[in-house]
Amino acid sequence: MLRACKANNVRRLAITSSIAAIRSVRQENWPADNTFDESFWSDTSPENTTISTYNTSKTLAEKAAWDFRESLPEAERFDIVTLNPALIMGPAHQTNDFASGGIVRDMMASSGPVGRTRMGMVDVRDVAKAHLLALKVDAAKNQRFLLVSKCAWRKEMVECLAAEFNPKGWNIGTEERTDDDVFNYEANTTASREVLGLEYIPIEQSWIDMANTLIESGFIPRPAASQ
């Protein structure tokens, strides 16, 4: 793709990367305040015993794109913008298994407690919009953009889903396990808000919209009482 852009005189390329290229799995490598921005790279060193193949692939792929650009003579370089979304939520129409849909499906099916996990999430519609803005906004050239609507606890998520769907026949649990290790980070999204001008959809709406579309597609079964 990068070679094709060069050969066809493409002026700017927006690349879908991931927060996995920014946030390491190993918490010992996190910043002191657990807050990530675009200056961070996921740790792919061989010494990292908790290395993730997913994080590694995303990190090396994005670095390869930047390295390719730098390898070109200055007169032949085109602009690159990378978008690094967190866990993507919002309307979905897949019927096959996928990570974020599986999380919502499992929450909808369980009355038990959830883990003590807080992670970044973003609406798929905001991710799409960010790609368009990355191509249009001049100041975005040759930058990375961390895309996070909110860093939310899983307990927040099940409470939101329970409030919306338990009156409709579901029995979604809202308790939190107390024996889990805490996984908790924050995201600094100043760049996406100020440079791209992105205004994020509230993540609570994203959870509800995702659940509704996955119910409609059959990915999330309806409770027996409502069928």
What are these regions (language model features)?
Residues 40-80:
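Active-site Tyr-X1-5-Lys
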Residues 74-76, 90-103, 133-145:
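Glycine/proline-rich active-site loop of Rossmann-fold NAD(P)-dependent oxidoreductases
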Residues 90, 114-117, 145-152, 180-181, ...:
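Glycine-rich Rossmann NAD(P)(H)-binding loop
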Residues 178-199:
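Conserved C-terminal active-site "lid" loop/helix of NAD(P)H-dependent oxidoreductases
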Residues 128-178, 189, 209-214, 218-227:
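Mid/C-terminal beta-alpha module of Rossmann-like enzyme folds, strongest
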Residues 105-145:
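Alpha-helical substrate-binding/gating segment
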Residues 1-49, 73-74:
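Conserved Rossmann-fold NAD(P)-dependent oxidoreductase catalytic core, especially the SDR/UDP-sugar
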Residues 21-27, 76-99:
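Flexible, glycine-rich beta-alpha linker
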